[in-house]
Amino acid sequence: MVKCRLRHVNNEVAMSQIFHLAVPAGDLATTVTFYTEVLGCQTGNSEHGRWVDVDFWGNELTLHQSTERLPGVRHDVDMGAVSVPHFGAHMSESDFKDLKQRIEQAEHDYLDPPYRRFKGTEFEQETFFISDPNGNVLEMKTMVNPEVLFKT
């Protein structure tokens, strides 16, 4: 089961570790359904018809009813061109596999299907890109050695 929940330290929510991002959602109900039913996230505080907070793997993602979409471009990186802007989450390998299964069962298309980067190095990871119903791009990933995330 995908764990899309707040992090706890000593039975308390680790508020200083929670990231907040607000994005345009287009049709709010449609986009909330994607985050809850496809990704397995839970909703929190909201203002009916205007915005909804989503527990996005322990981070606060606020979806705003909107008519606009964020413009996107592709940037070249080591494995090809990736969508920018994008946001996402790092997760355990088991949660990552569960999420892939949820996406595939929902028959939701990948923008960039799952692939491995940095094979054979300490930075090896598996990642994929999807978009929500309003075109916001998400990159979800799991690392073989998550402790090296910020290693230089």
Cite the ranges covered by each PLM segment.
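Vicinal oxygen chelate
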Residues: 28-29, 82, 87-134
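Conserved catalytic-core motifs of GNAT/GCN5-like acyltransferases
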Residues: 42-48, 115-118, 142-147
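Core segments of cupin and vicinal oxygen chelate
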Residues: 23-67
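A short, acidic/glycine-rich surface segment
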Residues: 69-75, 113-121, 148-149
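GNAT/GCN5-related N-acetyltransferase fold signature
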Residues: 130, 140-143
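N-terminal beta-strand motif that seeds the catalytic metal site of vicinal oxygen chelate
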Residues: 3-29, 87, 91, 142-152
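Residues that flank catalytic or metal-binding motifs in active/ligand-binding sites
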Residues: 17, 50, 57-59, 83-85, ...
